[in-house]
């Protein structure tokens, strides 16, 4: 009965959506006939005693029996202000979780990203303060400029490969992350990776907002005087921040809220402005720094010592892994923007080339500015914006104040755009997947913004070492998820997915994995195994008191992302070999050959899904593959 209700609710959404003011109405048919809603017509069918749900814009008002009016004020508040999607009122939370319009495959009309769109996307994303600080981290550890830049090239090349791998599922089947993860973790256990990503998006939002406080501080000093921080009494209770710094953070946080409230399809104008202004500000900053240093920069290490031997090797690895860890959330997010690709190649080579190229250019600017600042002031600033602050401290003229203000304004805008696109929108989309009845993207984004105040990002960002620790934390949890997803899709399933089963929880659904909990225990075990080796090193890195961690554990932790990724992938493959999963096109993935991914046609998906939804179980379903001429049944 619930399946019939859910099927009827989502009838014909592409033609005429349910009006928010009228929503869904229901009535019970206890007579001999039942009205069957099909394209706005009413035909009489066999006798069924059930509720029928229709869009009341399709029928005459006189034929509608409205839902009972609620007398309680709390009920009125609940239905009018808390419930968002009225189409889910007459189905359970479980059924609204399975399918809603935010999660369905992207139809051809909305798949409009060509190769150049992906280039623009990464061009806009690479210019932010966080990327500049990644380069500064290598210099802080003792590398010289070219060694640091080499780690950037290698690190972001690996990051690009991971992004492309993780986006293939979304690109081929036009699905977002909350759905793609169901294939490997299970229909309902997929909530755990989604919650992981929500938490990481909130933490990242807080960190990026704290970074946004730096250009805000420079703008205020440009207007009100370079000693503004000294004139504001410090009553902040943490040694890692001051009242002035928190005030700047709060200003950035408040200014962000109106932009978070803008609809996602309208906020694109902010990204357009960002992509146009940021390169001018970045290269202008670079030229200004080189001019002030008379073209002289420190080409050697910026520390008093140069590491050698194994010490150098592990510092090199740490700098390299910081680049990969910086992409941990974006690797998981890859299907969210991969699903809009016009064709299979649109999201492949552009991302593989653009990510290392654009981020290497940005990091090179950060490295040179930091090296020029060291030549000028004899201080190893790990954030290039600290160099900009020194410009203001040493030369407080009209020209310097104007230049610092403009560059700081553009970088604040860059942080705002990056925070919205990479964090608040991602959090909002994931929370929409978890609670479609109560949360839309706007509410989810506001929740992300509110929680950012509780993260205390000033403690995470107190030094470059704490910064790399924060990156490592993101990496060890998200890398295991990515490893399981890639192993399942590329090796176990060989690119084959039965789309309708990803949205069905009946008995026999491939992705319920034979249990009522919709959980793939193999994925859970592999996920834990991927995290476990990195935990001792993580504890040692964050400086837990009275705990001594061996050097070997720390070095394993320095390799955090690939360790988590490959261990979870290997464990998952071993478990799937001895305990095969349903819905695979091959019986032995180690010996049998074949690749079964196809560019999915989803224009009629909703009708196909409704047909499957009406079935009591899916136990007799088979795996069918397309060989280019016809559909063949595997079993």
From Swiss-Prot:
**What is the recorded membrane topology of this protein?**
Multi-pass membrane protein
- GO terms for MF: allantoin:proton symporter activity; nucleobase transmembrane transporter activity
Alphabetically, which GO biological process terms does the record hold? allantoin catabolic process; allantoin transport; nucleobase transport; purine nucleobase metabolic process
- Intervals, Cytoplasmic compartment: 1-144, 196-198, 265-269, 333-351, 423-443, 488-522, 582-635
Q: Where are the transmembrane segments?
A: 145-165, 175-195, 199-219, 244-264, 270-290, 312-332, 352-372, 402-422, 444-464, 467-487, 523-543, 561-581
- Residues on the membrane's Extracellular side span 166-174, 220-243, 291-311, 373-401, 465-466, 544-560
Keyword annotations for this protein?
Membrane, Purine metabolism, Transmembrane, Transmembrane helix, Transport
Q: Which CDD domains match?
A: SLC-NCS1sbd_NRT1-like (cd11482)
Question: Pfam families, per this entry?
Answer: Transp_cyt_pur
Q: What is any one of the record's Gene Ontology cellular component terms?
A: plasma membrane
Q: According to its UniProt record, where is this protein mainly located?
A: membrane
Superkingdom, natural source: Eukaryota
Q: Where in the cell is it found?
A: Membrane
Keyword Membrane part of the UniProt annotation: yes
Record-stated family: Belongs to the purine-cytosine permease (2.A.39) family.
NCBIfam families per the UniProt record, alphabetical: ncs1
What task does this protein carry out? Transport of allantoin.
What is this protein called in UniProt?
A: Allantoin permease
Identify the taxonomic lineage of the organism of origin: Eukaryota, Fungi, Dikarya, Ascomycota, Saccharomycotina
């Amino acid at each position: 009965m619930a399946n019939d209700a859910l099927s009827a609710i989502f009838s014909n959404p592409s033609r005429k959506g349910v009006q928010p003011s009228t929503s869904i109405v229901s009535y019970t048919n206890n007579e001999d006939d039942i009205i069957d809603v099909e394209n706005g017509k009413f035909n009489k069918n066999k006798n069924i005693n059930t509720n029928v749900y229709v869009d009341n814009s399709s029928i005459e008002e006189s034929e509608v029996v409205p839902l009972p009016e609620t007398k309680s004020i709390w009920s009125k508040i609940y239905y009018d202000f808390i419930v968002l999607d009225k189409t889910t009122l007459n189905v359970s939370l479980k059924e609204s979780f399975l399918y809603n319009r935010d999660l369905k495959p992207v139809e051809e009309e909305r798949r409009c990203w060509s190769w150049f769109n992906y280039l623009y996307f990464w061009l806009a994303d690479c210019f932010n303060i966080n990327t500049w600080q990644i380069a500064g981290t290598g210099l802080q550890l003792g590398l010289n400029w070219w060694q640091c830049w080499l780690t950037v090239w290698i690190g972001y090349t690996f990051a690009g490969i991971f992004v492309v791998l993780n986006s293939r599922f979304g690109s081929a089947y036009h699905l977002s992350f909350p759905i793609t993860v169901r294939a490997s973790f299970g229909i309902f256990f997929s909530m755990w990776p989604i919650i992981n990503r929500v938490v990481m998006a909130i933490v990242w939002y807080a960190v990026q907002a704290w970074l946004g406080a730096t250009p805000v501080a420079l703008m205020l000093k440009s207007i009100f005087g370079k000693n503004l921080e000294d004139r504001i009494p410090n009553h902040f209770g943490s040694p890692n921040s001051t009242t002035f710094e928190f005030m700047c953070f709060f200003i950035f946080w408040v200014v962000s809220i109106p932009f978070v409230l803008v609809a996602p399809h309208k906020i694109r104008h902010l990204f357009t402005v960002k992509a146009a202004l940021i390169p001018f500000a970045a290269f202008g900053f670079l030229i200004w720094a080189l001019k002030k240093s008379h073209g002289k920069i420190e080409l050697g290490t910026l520390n008093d010592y140069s590491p050698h031997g194994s010490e150098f090797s592990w510092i090199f690895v740490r700098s390299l892994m910081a680049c990969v860890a910086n992409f941990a959330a974006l690797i998981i997010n890859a299907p969210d923007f991969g699903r809009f690709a016009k064709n299979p190649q649109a999201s492949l080579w552009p991302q593989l080339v653009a990510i290392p190229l654009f981020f290497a250019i940005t990091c090179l600017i950060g490295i040179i500015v930091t090296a020029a600042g060291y030549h000028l002031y004899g201080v190893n600033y790990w954030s290039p914006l600290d160099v900009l602050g020194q410009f203001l401290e040493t030369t407080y003229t009209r020209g310097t104040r104007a230049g610092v203000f403009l560059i700081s304004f553009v970088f604040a805008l860059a942080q705002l755009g990056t925070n919205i696109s990479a964090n608040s929108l991602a959090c909002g989309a994931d929370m929409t997947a978890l609670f479609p009845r109560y949360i839309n993207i706007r509410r989810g984004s506001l929740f992300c913004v509110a929680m950012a105040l509780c993260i205390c990002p000033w403690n995470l960002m107190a030094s470059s070492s704490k910064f790399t620790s924060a990156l490592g934390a993101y990496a060890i949890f998200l890398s295991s998820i990515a490893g399981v997803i890639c192993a399942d899709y590329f090796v176990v399933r060989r690119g084959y997915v039965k789309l309708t089963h990803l949205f069905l929880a009946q008995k026999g659904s491939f992705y319920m994995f034979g249990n009522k909990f919709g959980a793939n225990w193999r994925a859970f075990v592999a996920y834990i195994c991927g995290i476990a080796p990195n935990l001792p090193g993580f504890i040692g890195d964050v400086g837990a008191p009275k705990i001594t961690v061996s050097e070997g554990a720390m070095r394993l932790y320095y390799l955090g992302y690939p360790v988590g990724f490959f261990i979870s992938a290997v464990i998952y493959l071993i478990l799937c070999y001895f305990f095969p999963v349903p819905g695979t096109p091959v019986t032995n993935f180690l010996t049998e050959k074949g690749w079964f991914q196809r560019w999915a046609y989803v224009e009629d998906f909703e009708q196909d899904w409704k047909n499957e939804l009406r079935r009591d179980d899916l136990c007799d379903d088979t795996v069918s593959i397309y060989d280019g001429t016809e559909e063949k049944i595997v079993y």
